[in-house]
Amino acid sequence: MIAFSERARIIAVASGKGGAGKTNVSVNLAVAFARLGGRTMLVDCDMGLANAAILLGMPSAWTIGDLLAGRCGIEDLLQRGPGGLQFLPGHSGTGSGSTLSAAERARLMEALRPYAARFDHIVIDTGGGIEASSLALVAAADTPLIVLTPEPTSFVDAYAMVKALSVSHGTPSFEILANMAPHDVAARALFDKFRAIVTRFIDVDLAYAGAIPADPFVREAVLRKRCVVEAFPGAPAARAFAALARRMACPPPPLPEPILAEVGHGAH
């Protein structure tokens, strides 16, 4: 039986570039948490490409854009997804473009703050890249989870994100998830290489979160507008997401201030 916290553990899923599978990781991890029995919320904050709703097969009349514009409340926005997951759908493009402004970010976090005590996990699918809005969300989370793939561009861009978070926000530690790895040995080697290079130049701690294997069932699930954890629970990737959720389903370290009260004060 998983012991959950009295306050939500906030996990910000990020990558330095598009194409690393960040949204797939966010959705499947959140659903895996919910299937463990944890009270879980998934927040799609990728305002440029808000695709989590597609992977869940949950189109919405309302989005975060409507919440920020005052056209609806958060209760109007929340949708019940697989395993009892509560989903807050994102919006492709806000008034300020594809990223949240500091004011919009503050309004969103203020709306979410009362829910911190009602959930065990809040998974945030952040925007791709190293825009200030994405960095602030990642820096404020209990667990910054960086998605890394074997592609050289992913390696370079993940390095840039870790460096930006360390320099701009003083973020001291990260969990690194090897995604689309051909096998466990290659995934671990990818992490070891990344850690060796990062820690040579940046004073941060990197922990190996695990690996999600390259799996054709992931693509098949996307074509069905479902997440692989629900569509093909016996698939290698689905089993890996379930294992990742079990490893991460533990109480966060105690914090002096509620994390959601701090997110709005990140980089502008």
Give residue spans per PLM region.
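Conserved C-terminal guanine-recognition region of P-loop GTPase G domains, centered on the G4
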Residues: 155-170
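Beta-strand-loop-alpha "switch" segments that mediate conformational coupling across diverse proteins
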Residues: 201-229, 241
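P-loop/Walker-type NTP enzyme "switch/lid" segment
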Residues: 42-117, 217-227
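Gly/Ala-rich phosphate-binding loop of Rossmann-like dinucleotide-binding domains
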Residues: 34, 138, 166
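Extreme N-terminal, non-catalytic leader segments
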Residues: 1-20, 24, 31-38, 72-76
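G-domain G4 guanine-recognition motif of GTPases
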Residues: 16, 149-150, 174-189, 211-218
